[in-house]
Regions:
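N-terminal Rossmann NAD(P)H-binding glycine-rich loop of SDR-like oxidoreductase domains
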Residues: 23-36
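Conserved NAD(P)H cofactor-binding loop of Rossmann-fold oxidoreductase domains
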Residues: 77-86
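Substrate-binding pocket helix/loop in short-chain dehydrogenase/reductase
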Residues: 87-88, 95-97
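Active-site-adjacent segment of SDR/Rossmann-fold oxidoreductases
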Residues: 117, 134, 155-164, 207
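C-terminal helical subdomain
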Residues: 161-164, 168-216
């Protein structure tokens, strides 16, 4: 079920309803993003296990099926993507590949397959993370994926047509994940969920493109 509201946003035709796909909208960060955006927008939640539409971003066929089912849309925000978390000393190439295939290529796939379908002046907002700038030993796979996403966003922004924008949100350690990941991040304060969700809102409702919006 979608959630409907109204919007007055100069990035689109003012006063029109903005339809936003939130991939990973049932996850920790995605839930906060959906809660914030659904007050003013028509939000469609897409996820691998739950949501309005099922999608596995590591599968081209699944992403194409998602777009066919949803139809027209004005923005896509992704808060999904897996990567291996574990000691670098024992990491295998298969474990490293998880982050490349899911978090990195999965998000790029959303853009490549959706760029011709999104409304004019629409936007893509991907997710990377602080671990690219401030890595921890257990998250090498995350750092690799995050770096690739940042590079893609900056490069793609130069060539996207029809005034379509693209940005990435780089969240810090989310408040709702602190209990799980806090021990691996000594001295790092958790970031409130609203602050992270608001970074997605800035990307979608603003004018910027090719930027990494840091929420940490």
């Amino acid at each position: 079920m979608t959630r409907r509201g109204t919007v007055a946003d100069d990035s689109f035709e003012g006063g029109t309803l903005v339809r936003i796909i939130v991939v990973g909208g049932a996850g920790t960060i995605g839930t906060a993003v959906v809660e914030l955006l659904s007050a003013r927008h028509d939000v469609v939640v897409a996820g691998r296990r739950s949501g309005d539409v099922r999608v596995d971003i590591s599968s081209r066929d699944s992403v194409q099926s998602m777009y066919r089912r949803i139809g027209s849309f004005d923005a896509l925000a992704c808060a999904a993507g897996e990567a291996h978390f574990g000691p670098f000393e024992t990491m295998t190439d298969e474990e490293l590949e998880l982050g490349v295939q899911s978090k990195l290529l999965g998000q790029l796939r959303l853009v490549l397959l959706g760029r011709s379908l999104i409304s004019e002046a629409g936007s893509f907002t991907l997710i990377c993370g602080y671990i690219f700038d401030d890595p921890i030993p257990e998250a090498t796979s995350f750092a690799v994926a995050n770096g690739g996403i940042e590079g893609f966003v900056r490069a793609a922004a130069l060539r996207l047509e029809r005034r379509v924008r693209i940005n990435a949100v780089s969240p810090g350690m989310a408040q709702d994940s602190y209990e799980q990941f806090g021990p691996f991040n000594p001295g790092r304060a958790p970031v409130p969920m609203l602050e992270i969700a608001s970074a997605f809102e800035r990307s979608i409702e603003g004018w910027r493109t090719g930027e990494i919006i840091r929420a940490w």
